[in-house]
Regions:
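ATP-binding N-lobe of GHMP and related small-molecule kinases
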Residues: 1-127, 131-147, 152, 166, ...
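ATP-dependent small-molecule kinase catalytic core of the GHMP/sugar-kinase superfamily
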Residues: 36, 143-226
């Protein structure tokens, strides 16, 4: 992902103006407590998503290229699609961002999405995608949102647009967390503390190969039960 400017230029015939990244996470303590307002203790992983953006001055369309899928999609509305899941997250971010900033001019964009986060493995690839997109939009439009507010907007995307009744943990640690530190979060008040991890500790993350997709699982049902 170090050659994102070359790839951006090859796809859109221009250089990007802004780029941001967001990382995947693993939760050490606190499953199901984030969306019930409890305490959690996640930390960042090395896997990340990078989103690069520039204004599209050639046409009145949004153009997005996702390197993992090797797929380019163009659109000019924010209607949720039925068969292109990754583009829904981008549309949702744009919808929430413009809804939050109703006085902004509708500027069409070119966006490059690059990621090495394993998908559907329960390490929050979707939250990292939303956070990276929103941070790039925040910089592009020079809004000045704090990282905590970016996390809140990312949660709105997943809840109000995508339709997953998740908590705030994933978005908060992806937006604010620091490598090498655990992220203690009170999910009710959103107060947090960065905690040093002991140097002599080693955490192993094991892939069960069970694919996870909250939109198609009983996640929302479990959320409502609690």
């Amino acid at each position: 992902m170090n050659n994102n400017n070359k790839i951006f230029n090859n796809i859109f015939q221009q250089s990007y103006s802004h780029a941001n990244e967001a990382h995947a996470r693993v939760n050490l303590i606190g499953e199901h407590t984030d969306y019930t307002g409890g305490y959690v203790l996640p930390c960042l992983l090395q896997y990340k998503t990078v989103v690069s953006v520039a204004e599209n001055k050639k046409s009145k369309t949004y153009n997005a290229y996702y390197e993992f899928y090797r797929e380019k999609i163009s659109f000019n509305d924010f209607i949720k699609s039925k068969n292109k899941q990754w583009i829904d997250y981008l549309k949702g971010c744009l919808f929430v961002f413009y809804d939050e900033n109703k006085t902004l001019d509708n500027i069409y964009l070119n966006l490059l999405i690059q990621s090495n986060i394993p998908m559907r493995r329960g390490i929050s690839s979707s939250s990292a995608l939303c956070v990276a997109i929103l941070k790039s939009l925040n910089d592009f439009f020079n809004i000045g949102y704090a990282d905590k507010h970016i996390a809140i907007l990312a949660q709105k995307v997943e809840r109000n647009y995508i339709g997953v009744s998740g908590g705030i943990m994933d978005q908060m640690v992806s937006s604010i967390g620091i490598h090498g530190k655990a992220f203690f979060l009170d999910c009710l008040t959103l107060k947090y503390e960065l905690i040093n991890l002991p140097n002599n500790y080693c955490f192993e993350l094991v892939d069960s190969e069970v694919q996870r997709e909250n939109r198609k699982s009983a996640y929302n049902e479990r959320h409502n039960q609690l």
